[in-house]
A protein has these predicted regions:
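Bimodal "functional hotspot" detector
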Residues: 1-152
Length: 152
């Protein structure tokens, strides 16, 4: 066998593998169904704030993306040493984004106090902080619990 044929036999599989890798990277970038966010939670027994990276499904519209993020945030942290923002069973009833303001409605379970979650004022403050930090198009977050606007 000629020297050039041997080189081609070695080079051809490497070329095919390189093209396959490049194609898979492009397809992953285009079709990646997840968006990476950084969420902030308090720690049990301290005033420290820690971050947690979370993958949230990509949605078609900006408003739906904020809704998916908020739903995931309200579910609480994945790490047991971090405090959920609200009591167990709290859900997002609505999430509307208009003119740089997010209007977020939480179920009445957010009013329940538990040692297993942050206090209500801290939970609302952390909810606002998380949304504003992850979505640069949103400047203000107004929170409603059981359809009544609350400050935090």
């Amino acid at each position: 066998m000629k020297e050039s044929t041997k080189k081609q036999l070695v080079f051809l599989p490497l070329l095919i593998m390189g093209l396959a890798l490049a194609l898979s990277a492009v397809l992953y970038a285009v079709r990646n169904p997840w968006h990476r966010y950084v969420m902030f939670f308090g720690e049990y027994g301290s005033d420290k704030i820690y971050s947690e990276t979370r993958l949230v499904s990509k949605e078609d519209t900006f408003q739906d993306q904020v809704q998916a993020f908020t739903d995931s945030l309200v579910l609480g942290p994945r790490t047991n040493r971090f405090l959920p923002l609200f009591a167990s069973g709290t859900t997002v009833e609505f999430c509307i984004v208009k003119d740089g303001t997010a209007y977020v409605g939480l179920s009445e379970n957010a009013l329940f106090f538990s040692e297993e979650c942050a206090d209500i004022k801290t939970g609302i403050s952390m909810l606002k902080r998380n949304i504003v930090r992850n979505f640069t198009n949103i400047d203000t977050v107004e929170v409603y619990i059981d359809s009544i606007q609350v400050e935090g």
